Regions:
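Short coil-to-helix leader/linker segments, especially the first N-terminal amphipathic alpha-helix
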Residues: 1-8
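Membrane translocator/pore-forming domains, dominated by Gram-negative outer-membrane beta-barrels
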Residues: 7, 16-21, 25-278
């Protein structure tokens, strides 16, 4: 949910001629694996300054986020929710030759409320409330090939995430959620077509991609014994979207995403964003 994506975060930036802008984004959806179901709502807003360079448009800004996540495990497994708040900075460059580069760094504080169950050990850790800290660093690059009123845009993205450790206890037993590090990659391609709706311009687009864990290290210990060690995962992403430039200042976007072939998949997510430039 906290992962970055330029188009979903701020919509279509090409063609904007302004000095600054404010934007907001709402992402909601659900996902699942063999062992649990996952619902999420992510709200993000930001402000940026637009700089007109000799060969590019540069957007530099700040962002704040709030995320609500609910996890429902199978009977006798882990259940709970996470409420997160975060803040970050970003820089996006759109070059005249079609190339673009987006970078973001973000800090997130996570407040957890969970019931943990380890059936093989016959141990439960009930009503555990604790917080952790996460740091995200991401970069996305792509190139837009313009084809008349349409385009094809290959993309590549990598995100590093670091989570802090949590130490819990219940009924004389200790539960340690070790600090974790992860590196997630994404390769994909979007294709779109621009057309007019009255006085507005709209771009309908579709995308397909492959997301995978390049590196992943996380582990849960119960009384010093390893009880869980998540393995790497990968999935295919599929997207449909519509970006509308209502006028020179206002733009909105809507997209749908799902994934397949992963141990965990997004069943459906809906992303909407709005931007006002001035």
């Amino acid at each position: 949910v906290e992962m970055n994506n330029l188009n979903k975060r701020m919509g279509e930036l090409r063609g904007i001629d302004a000095n600054a802008g404010v934007w907001a984004r709402v992402l909601g959806g659900k996902g699942s694996s063999d062992s649990y179901k996952h619902k999420f709502t992510h709200i993000q807003t930001g402000f940026d300054k637009q700089s007109h360079l000799s060969n590019a448009e540069l957007f530099t800004g700040v962002t704040v986020t709030h995320t609500s996540t609910d996890i429902e495990g199978k009977i006798g497994s882990t259940n709970g929710d996470v409420k997160s708040i975060g803040a970050g900075v970003y820089a996006t460059a759109l070059f005249d030759n079609g190339f673009y580069l987006d970078t973001i760094a973000k800090y997130v504080k996570n407040n957890h409320k969970f019931d943990y169950a380890f059936k093989e050990m016959k141990l439960d850790f009930k009503s555990q409330q604790y917080h952790t800290h996460s740091f995200y660093l991401g970069g996305e690059v792509g190139y837009r090939f313009n084809l008349g009123s349409g385009y094809v845009e290959p993309q590549a993205e990598v995100i590093y995430v670091k989570n802090s450790q949590a130490n819990l206890a219940d009924n004389g037993h200790k539960l340690t959620i070790k600090a974790s590090n992860g590196l997630v990659g994404r390769l994909g391609v979007n294709a779109g077509k621009t057309f007019e709706i009255g006085q507005s311009k709209a771009t309908a687009w579709a995308g397909i991609g492959y997301q995978w864990d390049i590196a992943k290290r996380n582990e849960i210990l119960v009384d010093g014994i390893s009880a869980s060690n998540s393995k790497k995962d990968a999935r295919m992403l599929m997207d449909l979207g519509l970006n509308i430039r209502a006028n020179n200042k206002l733009s909105i976007g809507l997209s749908l995403e799902g994934s397949v072939f992963g141990k965990y998949n997004t069943d459906l997510s809906v992303n909407s964003n709005i931007r006002y430039s001035f």
